[in-house]
Amino acid sequence: MNEREALRTFGTGENFHAQHYFGFHETEKNGVKGYIFRVWAPNAEDLHLIGDFTGWFDNPLQMDKNEAGVWEVFTDLPKEGHIYKYLVKRQGGQIVEKMDPFAIYLEERPGTGSLIRTIPEKKWKDGLWLGRRKRWGFFKRPVNIYEVHAGSWKQNEDGSPYSFEQLKDELVPYLVKMNYTHVEFMPLMAHPLGMSWGYQLMGFFAFEHTYGTPEQFQDFVEACHLNNIGVIVDWVPGHFTQNDDALAYFDGTPTFEYQDHDRAHNYRWGALNFDLGKNQVQSFLISSAKFWIDFYHIDGIRVDAVSNMLYLDYDEGPWQPNIEGNNRNLEGYYFLQRLNTVLKLAHPDVMMIAEESTATTKITGRREEGGLGFDYKWNMGWMNDILKFYEEDPIYRKYDFNLVTFSFMYLFSENFILPFSHDEVVHGKKSLMHKMWGDRYNQFAGLRNLYTYQICHPGKKLLFMGSEFGQFLEWKYDHALEWTNLEEEDGLNLKMQDFTSQLNQFYKDHKVLWQLDTSYDGLEIIDADNVDESVLSFIRKNEKGDLLVCVFNMVPVERKGFTIGVPVAGIYEEVWNTELEEFGGVWKEHNMTVKTQKNLWKEYENTLSFTLPALGASIWKIKRRLRK
């Protein structure tokens, strides 16, 4: 794309590689080698380039403005490693220093400048992974995600977070050991506070320097791919930090944000909302998403805070109805549809995931049918119901059994991911282990039951770091995980970690748990009405008709001779039991194999009887089918 076309399409919202035009680029002019700098600031009164190469304010370089509101200057003064900023004179005379919105490198805090650094093109070695990803897709593949905050998974002795060079050496082998299929990172784009959650971004192309360099993250992704692990990143296209040195009121007027003050300001999060209806903003944001896919070979993008982009009244501040008289953010709907259209045309094998907390329909619906076009939506309703149920005293669970079964009413209205995310283990909500009912032993039993239910329930899976070994304390973004839990004398945390690893492998090994995740063809409810005993049972199936019988005892009462109906007569073997001693339970071995009996049980003609462990989950597989 030539420069004229790049400028034109940026203004029409159709430049999806805007970083190739904006920012700084090495070039040659009149036989002189140097750099050209470009920035969009349509309403600035004047604009200069300053940096190490100008003595900062000593000799600022005047930039020229074109008819599209883009300022540019060519200079041979900068050197590799120099820091630069834009000196923006706003209408009215105020002068502010701004970072480059398209910078890939930002200087280390407390500095706020952008860095001139050329990143050599990487010779990737993950072609086999990318080829399989394109060939296999993900809907009929196992997806089990380990959610990570890069700054607090592990830390150095001085309290600094691991770099991605260190994470490559330690996190990648851990993901392999724990049998996860994907890792998802909370925001890695530059944000004002390194030790934070990271959801108020300042650099949408820049890598957060707290975690190392872009090259280190490229190497990390490659290492993941070479070990058959996909990488997903969180991305926040709805709002951005209101820090004055970043995007906020860039040229002195609403530039990236809405013109209307109330729409521009996000009162709940103390941030600014992108004007999603502005063409230049669409070019900027879609270019950002595409850059992370192309440059880092990532396998998925989780779009944060989608609800805030869809509803004018989602925030706590004042709002005005749209032209149709309702609360829908029409620009937000259009932008998300366009985002998914563009990205899926270029990368149909990259997952687009929505973190959306309302009852809005068609989040994963087809765009041509009015849907937003995401591949998956986090099932926040399921998560809230399930955690409320597992926190409850078992005596009362029969009165709230609908919390466990309600999801079967809307299972396939969207393509869901079942998340136990960072949001559920902070702000006094307690860790997942601490949420569980009972003493320490029963809490671990409940956790094993919970994770098995998540694995067996239709939908892809996500678990936040630390939960895999039952960390007791809440997550703190400025503290490393409690790895010392694994050294507890009773060994329950270590056994919990091993349980999670084996459960994840069990999931990968059984197609019935993931091949038909978006259809009732993959699910058959045996009994969702046994509220008095608080036992839930259902069957998962694959395309060949193989099946697993999944039974969950939600109370601490062992049930001998427990009987359910099954659709196939045969010899059944127990292939999973959460109460085995090796997992921290009390059972020394599995149930013995069981032959079905010919009895009428509801609509079934065959029954299966076995001992159901207290507060346990038991999964059965047909070892040999019997003739009718």
Curated annotation (Swiss-Prot):
Catalytic activity: Transfers a segment of a (1->4)-alpha-D-glucan chain to a primary hydroxy group in a similar glucan chain
Pathway: Glycan biosynthesis; glycogen biosynthesis
Keywords of this entry: Carbohydrate metabolism, Glycogen biosynthesis, Glycogen metabolism, Glycosyltransferase, Transferase
Source species, domain of life: Bacteria
SUPFAM superfamilies: (Trans)glycosidases (SSF51445), E set domains (SSF81296), Glycosyl hydrolase domain (SSF51011)
Gene3D superfamilies, A to Z: Glycosidases (3.20.20.80), Golgi alpha-mannosidase II (2.60.40.1180), Immunoglobulins (2.60.40.10)
Molecular function (Gene Ontology), one example: 1,4-alpha-glucan branching enzyme activity
Pfam families xref list: Alpha-amylase (PF00128), Alpha-amylase_C (PF02806), CBM_48 (PF02922)
CDD domains noted in UniProt: AmyAc_Glg_BE, E_set_GBE_prok_N
Active site: 304 (nucleophile), 355 (proton donor)
Enzyme class: transferase
GO biological process, one term: glycogen biosynthetic process
GO cellular component: cytosol
EC number: 2.4.1.18
Function: Catalyzes the formation of the alpha-1,6-glucosidic linkages in glycogen by scission of a 1,4-alpha-linked oligosaccharide from growing alpha-1,4-glucan chains and the subsequent attachment of the oligosaccharide to the alpha-1,6 position.
Family: Belongs to the glycosyl hydrolase 13 family. GlgB subfamily.
HAMAP family linked: GlgB
Assembly, per entry: Monomer.
Name used for this protein in its record: 1,4-alpha-glucan branching enzyme GlgB
Annotated source species: Streptococcus mutans serotype c (strain ATCC 700610 / UA159)
Lineage: Bacteria, Bacillati, Bacillota, Bacilli, Lactobacillales
